[in-house]
Each structure stands twice: as C-alpha cells, then as structure tokens.
Amino acid sequence: MLRSGVMPNEVSFSSLLKDPLQFHLLQIHSLVTRLGYDGYDYVSSAIISSYASHEMVSDALAYGGLLDPDSCVVSMNVLAGVYNRVRMYEEVKKLLLHQGSNDTVSWSILITACAKNGDYAEAFKIFKRMRICGHHFDRYASVSLLSICTKSNSLVLGSSLHGLIIKTNSGCLDTYVHNILLDMYAKCGRIEDCLKAFKEMEGRNIISWTAVISGLALNGFSHKALAWFKAMEEDGFNPDNVAVTAVLSSCRHGGLVHEGMKIFRHMKSDYSLEPEMEHYICVVDMLCKCGYLKEAEVVIRDMPFQPSAVIWRTFLQGCQTYGVIDAQVFS
C-alpha cells in the first residue's frame, strides 16, 4: 500500500490491528503515531486491544492513559476491559464513573468490575444510574447482576431483574442469560421457578439441562434429578463430564447407589467419557456414605491415576463411621 503511494486511514489501520504479530504491532503503532491517527477512537481502541492480546498489558495501560477520555469512549471501554482482566477494579471505576460520555458498554463494564470485586451494592447503584441515564442494559450487565443475586442468595432482586428483562424486551434474554437464571433460581432454593424458566426457554443446550439437574440435586430431589438426566438423553443431548458429575452428585446425596454406579461404569461405553477425579470423588463418597466400603476400596484401587486427598479423607471417614479397620487398599 505504502509503496504504491496509498496512505492508510483509520479504517485500514483498524483492520491491520485486528490480529498482527507482535513485531508488526510495534511497527503499525509507530506508523499510526507518525501519521497522526492516535486521536481516532477506533484506531486507539484497536491498539489497546492488540497490546492486551499479546500479553503486553503494561503497554496497553500506558498507551490508554495518554488518551483523552471524553473523546475516546470506545478506547476507554477497551482500556477498562483490560483493567478488569488484570483485576484492577478500582481503576475501572476511576476511569469510567466520572466520564461524561458513558455508553451501554461502559456501564456494563462498571457493573462487571463491581461484581468481580465483591461490591454488590455498588453494582446495583450503578445499574440504577444507568437506567436513570436512559441506557438499556445488555446481556453482560444482566449476567453480572444475576451472578451477584446467586452469590448473595438475593432471590427478590434476581426475580425482579428477571421481570425487568422480560418487561423491557431488552433482547438480552438469550440462552446464556437464561442458563444464569436457572442457576440463580436453583441456588436460591426456588426449584419451581427454575423448572418454569427452563420450560420457557427456546434454545436449550447441555448447560441448561445440567443447571436443572444440579439444582434438583442441590434441593434434595435426587430421583427427579435422575429422571431429568434420562430426559436430557431422550431429548438428544449426550451428557458431558459436567452433566455426569451433576447426576452422580444427586445419586450421592440421595443414596442412589445402584443408579449412580450404573452411570459411572457406563461412562465410557455410553457417553465416550473417561471418568475424571470429580467423578471418582462423587462415587467414593456415595459408596462410603451408604456403607459400601469394600466397593469403594475397589473403585479407589482401580483408579487410573493417584487418588486425591479428598478421596482418601472420604474413605477414611467412611471406615471410621462404620468401624472398618481392615481395608486392604493401603497394602
């Protein structure tokens, strides 16, 4: 381009900066500066993003700090995203809270920063300010706020937010957000609302099914969790490792030893899955709690890798509970 006498502009620079090699990035940045395109918001944001993607975080932050916040809204959002990535949450707030030209993305980044930093009340205050300023919230803000409700067991807030998402028709109630809702209702003890939200979903995936199965197990409905696991298979979803962990956990809590062992033993043949440590922990705990210590001993002995400290502790507690002292697994 340069050899033919055609000078790059903000569009070509933005395109060049999408995925450059590190050496090329430095050269492009130098050319951007020489040609005076530093002040173009999309070019500046692309430079910050490229530095961050090459793990040159200090360069990204240093460059972003030289820009005018009021004239580079997109760049400030990208810079705030980098601060979030390196857990400098207070810097995110300093950067965006006093900026007069925040957009929906800016507000969402602020809410995410507060959520990750444990400032739950502040996150909802910012959400309120966002709404007062007339900005619609997006899926990122929804996910952060619903996650706060889950962690703080705030069912009223979570349910209200769900209603607001539906009422405003914000377009953010996609499968991902719906899955967060399922998790929130389940962990807040409202399994009926979890099941209702699931039935209202259009784009269910394996995560949706797993959230319901985990929720049923968490709330003491082990038999229902097992039934939903079977329904998931009938609906055409092949269980993944997380889904199997969820159903094994439900069998553990409900004492469904026969059903749990059947799923565990057929993981490879039925689902093409190799049992992982988490599966062994569930199975050993299930067997030990129900007094099947010999069977637990066999499972531990046949493990293809070294048992974890959790497995040993679980097994020893089972031996102590049932007064068994002649386990051969140590020999």
Please annotate each region the language model reported.
Residues 1-28, 32-331:
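Alpha-helical hairpin repeat boundaries in alpha-solenoid proteins
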